[in-house]
């Protein structure tokens, strides 16, 4: 699956005819390229008691960049029936007392805060891929839709400017590609320029603001920025929010 190849660094060989490949399959392939280092760990390796009839496996992959860190969790259900399980922070190597923003990569769905533990459903013969990012006091990156690892390969740097209340960064992808960057903040913040060119939604779970920033790669690098303001302040009138 794209999830397994995306979270692992092993070589990938393709036997497809790229000229006849369905666009949807081609998009999946692009989400596992380029290849990234480090292997995921089996989070349930020493706790699994039924390896014959219960084919449910959990993998974790902590990712660290100079600009930030997050944890990926892939849950594979190879059973022919749906399964429900409990994700535990300790199992994933995370602090049980810390709140994390939780995002479902394949469903493109923000799942609110994760703290300590949470029950999840996994469809039959399927998998779910979650990204956990420690909650910050300012807007931050939630995910991207360009790579399974959601920032390790395609986000070169991210910077929050407290004085200017601006989140900015550099994205890298092949020229001609398109993608989306997902940002998140608590309800104390709002985008400063009437959401120009972006999609903005408010979570019903925790009132968090989720912003989808479209990126178009005319060459292999895009520099972007989004200006914010306190949610109780009047909006700014006119200025580009993304460069």
Predicted region positions:
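Beta-strand elements of well-folded, non-transmembrane domains
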Residues: 171-175, 187, 228-232
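Short beta-strand/loop motifs in extracellular/secreted proteins, especially
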Residues: 83-85, 98-100, 177-181, 188-192, ...
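Short edge beta-strand/loop segments characteristic of extracellular beta-sandwich folds
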Residues: 74-76, 168-172, 182-184
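Solvent-exposed beta-strand/loop surfaces of large extracellular or lumenal domains
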Residues: 98-117, 191-215
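Surface beta-strand/loop "capping" patches
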Residues: 46-70, 137-175
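C-terminal beta-strand-rich structural cap/linker in extracellular carbohydrate-active enzymes
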Residues: 112-154, 205-243
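A generic structural signal for beta-strand entry/edge sites
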Residues: 68-72, 82, 117-119, 162-168, ...
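Active-site-proximal substrate-binding groove within the catalytic cores of carbohydrate-active enzymes
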Residues: 1-136
């Amino acid at each position: 699956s794209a999830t397994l190849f995306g979270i692992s660094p092993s070589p990938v060989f393709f036997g497809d005819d790229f000229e006849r490949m369905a666009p949807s399959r081609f998009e999946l392939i692009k989400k596992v390229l380029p290849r990234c280092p480090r292997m995921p760990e089996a989070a349930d390796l020493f706790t699994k008691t039924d390896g014959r009839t219960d084919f449910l496996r959990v993998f974790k992959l902590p990712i660290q960049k100079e600009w930030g860190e997050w944890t990926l969790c892939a849950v594979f259900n190879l059973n022919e029936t749906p399964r429900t399980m409990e994700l535990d922070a300790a199992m994933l190597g995370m602090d049980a007392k810390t709140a994390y923003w939780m995002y479902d990569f394949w469903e493109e769905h923000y799942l609110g805060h994760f703290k300590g533990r949470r029950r999840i459903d996994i469809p039959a013969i399927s998998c779910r891929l979650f990204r956990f990012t420690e909650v910050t006091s300012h807007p931050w990156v939630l995910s991207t839709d360009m790579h399974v690892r959601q920032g390790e390969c395609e986000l070169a740097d991210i910077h929050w400017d407290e004085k200017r209340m601006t989140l900015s960064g550099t994205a890298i992808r092949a020229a001609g590609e398109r993608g989306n960057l997902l940002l998140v903040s608590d309800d104390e913040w709002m985008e400063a320029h009437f959401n120009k060119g972006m999609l903005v939604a408010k979570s019903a779970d925790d009132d968090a603001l989720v912003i989808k920033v479209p990126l178009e790669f005319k060459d292999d690098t895009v520099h972007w920025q989004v200006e914010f303001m306190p949610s109780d302040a009047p909006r700014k009138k006119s200025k580009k929010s993304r460069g």
